[in-house]
Amino acid sequence: MTTETISGITLTTKANVYFDGKCISHGFTLADGTKKSAGVVLPSQLTFGTAAAEIMECVAGSCEYKLDGSDQWLTSKAGESFQVPANSKFDIRVTEAYHYICHYA
């Protein structure tokens, strides 16, 4: 299932811009205090670090990702998600715009 709209949020209007503009996101908070972000990764190969555990939900496009300690690239496309442990990192490879929601666990 792909999340298309989210109601009742507080949006951080200033964008987070990473990797010279290859990843742009906006943070938001749900009514219950849960924090998330929504963004896009443009065609590139990047490495992200995590503090909290994350669930990356693909809402459009697709990506290949490789979790820390793995040599295997896996694919995530619209309607799918993947989990990244806390205090870890992951590589992401994108050939078309990858739109996502990051759920912090």
Swiss-Prot record:
HAMAP family: Nucleos_phosphorylase_PpnP
An MF annotation (GO) of this entry: guanosine phosphorylase activity
Family statement drawn from the similarity comment of this UniProt entry: Belongs to the nucleoside phosphorylase PpnP family.
UniProt keyword annotations, A-Z: Glycosyltransferase, Transferase
Role: Catalyzes the phosphorolysis of diverse nucleosides, yielding D-ribose 1-phosphate and the respective free bases. Can use uridine, adenosine, guanosine, cytidine, thymidine, inosine and xanthosine as substrates. Also catalyzes the reverse reactions.
Catalytic reaction equation(s): a purine D-ribonucleoside + phosphate = a purine nucleobase + alpha-D-ribose 1-phosphate; adenosine + phosphate = alpha-D-ribose 1-phosphate + adenine; cytidine + phosphate = cytosine + alpha-D-ribose 1-phosphate; guanosine + phosphate = alpha-D-ribose 1-phosphate + guanine
CDD domains xref list: cupin_PpnP-like
Source organism (scientific name): Delftia acidovorans (strain DSM 14801 / SPH-1)
Official protein name in the record: Pyrimidine/purine nucleoside phosphorylase
Top-level EC class as recorded in UniProt: transferase
